């Protein structure tokens, strides 16, 4: 006896509900109405990011991305995608400001300047930490989930994706199952 599959229709399907999946969904929601996140873990758990410190390495406006990339190329012995790193660093300050707008608080000194910790022995690489320290990953997860909720991004947990559905060379969906019930799912 086979279970009748759950069938979901969406404009954009995001596989993975961690920080990257959440940001992908927020970006997709700027362009389409119906966005769905599926995750193998519990709904809204935040992936491994939820267990992080909630801190960020950010290229502040006074630095040039190419200078930070140069430091990272040295640090990683050249084994990094420099163009990708530069793009991430160029966007990092905007994401930092987005987090602050959503209510994530980064530590500041008495004069209001951001506090940072140098990273990896590099001159320009700075780590900006969540305040109060120690609960930042959980808080980041909460604010991302609140923003997803505000924008009506649908989220389903405990979904194991087993394959992608293709229409020619284009991916048009995914198939999997609900991990607790075993019910097949088609997206």
Give the location of each predicted region.
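Conserved N-terminal/central alpha/beta ligand/cofactor-binding core
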Residues: 3-4, 40-180
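N-terminal charge/polar-biased segments
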Residues: 1-9, 19, 154
């Amino acid at each position: 006896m086979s279970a009748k599959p759950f069938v979901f229709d969406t404009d954009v399907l995001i596989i993975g509900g961690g920080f990257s999946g959440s940001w992908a969904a927020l970006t997709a929601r700027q362009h389409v109405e119906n966005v769905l996140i599926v995750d193998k873990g519990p709904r809204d758990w935040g992936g491994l990011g939820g267990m992080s410190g909630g801190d960020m390495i950010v290229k502040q406006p006074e630095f040039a991305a190419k200078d930070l990339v140069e430091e990272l190329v040295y640090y990683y012995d050249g084994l990094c995608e420099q163009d990708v790193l530069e793009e991430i660093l160029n966007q990092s300050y905007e994401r930092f400001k987005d987090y602050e707008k959503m209510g994530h608080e980064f530590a500041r000194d008495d004069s209001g300047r951001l506090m940072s910790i140098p990273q990896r022995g590099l001159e320009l690489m700075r780590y900006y930490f969540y305040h109060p320290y120690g609960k930042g990953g959980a808080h980041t997860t909460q604010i991302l989930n609140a923003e997803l909720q505000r924008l009506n991004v649908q989220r389903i947990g405990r979904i194991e994706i087993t394959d992608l559905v293709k229409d020619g060379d284009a991916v048009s969906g995914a198939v999997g199952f609900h991990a607790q019930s075993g019910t097949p799912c088609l997206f």
